[in-house]
Amino acid sequence: MSSNDSNDTDKQHTRLDPTGVDDAYIPPEQPETKHHRFKISKDTLRNHFIAAAGEFCGTFMFLWCAYVICNVANHDVALVAAPDGSHPGQLIMIAIGFGFSVMFSIWCFAGVSGGALNPAMSLSLCLARAVSPTRCVVMWVSQIVAGMAAGGAASAMTPGEVLFANSLGLGCSRTRGLFLEMFGTAILCLTVLMTAVEKRETNFMAALPIGISLFIAHVALTAYTGTGVNPARSLGAAVAARYFPHYHWIYWIGTLLGSILAWSVWQLLQILDYTTYVTAEKAASTKEKAQKKGETSSSSAVAEV
């Protein structure tokens, strides 16, 4: 046997499974390239820049669409709120605008930056260790700047008064407004943690329940607080309207407390190891169904005899 044939045989054996199973082919290792494009995972600065760009574009797209829809709802004379309450059609239009806008924005940019689009969500993700503190700060800056840019763009492109800023209504006090914002944000952030962070087969559909939860939050809170549940949304609208009420702080403190509350509930479930319990329940249910099916089959066989 020539030396070339021997080398070819050695190379072939190196590609086989070391256990000796000849049909288990293992492809040869590819040479490591030195091109910087293939080391992007180690380029932290570039990764942060991509995340910042994704959060800016996603937040801008979400809030610009929502602001314009909100402006239309509040300018339409047929949907003007009565002095003693809000028009149902007005609430539904605003809620649909925000819910659907965040839904398609998350679907577009979740693969780029995670699609938080909300400083309160970013805080919950950071507390859950889904993103690093540095990435959280980067996302915060992008989201807040995008909120102000979206507010300015919506104000410049639509005629008339800016009518998408948050304000208290229906006699709601600052304390009540604080807790409404807190619990509304908690529901939204908990939805994110349970549908996007938790490993499930339905993670790819997380944008749908997130959009639905924001829709419900707007139906519930708009008449009382204008529904902030997002500091970037509240700040962007306030800058565009040049309207900063003395209670503007509730749209920051309330939402951040809500994100912490959502994380606390999620963390409690992790401590209780709820996934093990759910898995055991599913296994027991499957076993019980299999036993019943076996008993039914046995009974049918006896009856035939």
From Swiss-Prot:
The keyword Repeat is annotated on this UniProt entry: yes
Compositionally biased tracts (Basic and acidic residues): 286-295
Motif NPA 1: where in chain: 118-120
Positions of short motif NPA 2: 230-232
UniProt main location, coarse: endoplasmic reticulum
Residue ranges crossing the lipid bilayer per the database entry: 49-69, 92-112, 137-157, 177-197, 204-224, 249-269
Domain notes: Aquaporins contain two tandem repeats each containing three membrane-spanning domains and a pore-forming loop with the signature motif Asn-Pro-Ala (NPA).
PANTHER family to which the protein is assigned, alphabetical: AQUAPORIN TRANSPORTER (PTHR19139), MIP17260P (PTHR19139:SF199)
Official protein name in the record: Aquaporin-1
Lineage: Eukaryota, Fungi, Dikarya, Ascomycota, Saccharomycotina
Gene: AQY1
